[in-house]
């Protein structure tokens, strides 16, 4: 007979390992390649020493002259708070009782819930890797008869629960925890649950975020590629080595544009690009460029079972969350996902995973991870934007 106790054991012993593996390597090739470590985690924070420049204790001199003065390595400390990442499943008591004498039916029930959790978590984690930590999904352009027009639907999907916020980030109390009912990708419009929103409630330039996630998401690639503001607690205006290579208004993509960025990183930061990430439109544009000049398109096998085209042995991968017209040239060895622990089930004092929801005939289980992403050498990364897509 199937019981809640046996379901608990299944979640711990059968599902956790598979889900962890999928979330660590199956989200996208970039995440599969970067390191994951519990080092440099102190309490609720990540504190990591970052070296920049070179050791100054070198020089040349006369046969009997003074030796060079010592001048050790340059260090600064990166500081980030661990972000709290959650995924939740829910099973009704009715569904459990209906399948208590049918193990196969209960397994199918759990499989369906876990597959849904895995898909949603993979989607959300993959999206965050390209964000700036604020959790902004898009901006509102207009609201007409409850239909919301936004500037981009790349980060939106049916079923997502979102909050609407003022452009300053302040929550709009009448427009929180709204579930997306439909997404029109050609018109860039969405509809949401609840009473119809108006342009007075949600004015132009309001922002959309995942429920309760504003300012709580991991520090993704967008946070790195800026020449102003702070990064990891340091001001870029006084720490110029935090500023990466950025070229805007690229237009037509070519090998020369890519090689110029790679050469800059090698000559000025000593960085070796080992992964290129771009939007699908940029990848198609590069493939068109190769075809125009009758170049062979080489295909590579990557960790995690992925395949990619290559440029001089460097894989070029497209990602659905990469901004349009953008290409990132990265040294994955500079990135580390610092974590307090790997994915775990949230357990009660009794050690149980599945817990009854207060006042409801349902049980829920929550998957958690406390982590954030740090790039040890931001100046060793590059971004090309304004690329004409195909």
Language-model features: where?
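Core alpha/beta structural scaffold of self-assembling particle/tube/pore-forming proteins
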Residues: 1-59, 71-390
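Glycine-rich loop at the start of a catalytic domain that most often binds anionic cofactors/ligands
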Residues: 63-64
